[in-house]
């Protein structure tokens, strides 16, 4: 018998590239390409927007120091995000 999936977050436009991060507050990180946002969802289901990336955020990664790296597809940029800002 197939299992029914559990909804972790809804009202998203085009969620992409989920990445799990452990730590004091484990979260699933993902891009919402059409909304232009990098977001997280925690184990309790709380969704948070971490960065606005208007030109379609896609792949995510991290520098060794913990800063987020985001691919911005439409403008061909690789961006670093720290403390709520993108550059």
Question: Each predicted region: which residue ranges?
Answer:
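Sequence-structural signature of mature extracellular/luminal beta-sheet repeat domains
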Residues: 1-87
């Amino acid at each position: 018998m197939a299992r029914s999936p559990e909804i972790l977050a809804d009202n998203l436009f085009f969620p992409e590239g989920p990445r799990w991060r452990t730590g004091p507050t484990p979260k699933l990180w993902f891009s919402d390409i059409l909304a232009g946002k990098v977001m997280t969802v925690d184990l309790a289901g709380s969704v948070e927007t971490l960065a606005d990336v208007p030109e379609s955020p896609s792949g995510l990664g991290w520098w060794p120091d913990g800063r987020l790296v985001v691919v911005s597809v439409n403008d061909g940029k690789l961006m670093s995000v720290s403390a709520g800002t993108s550059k």
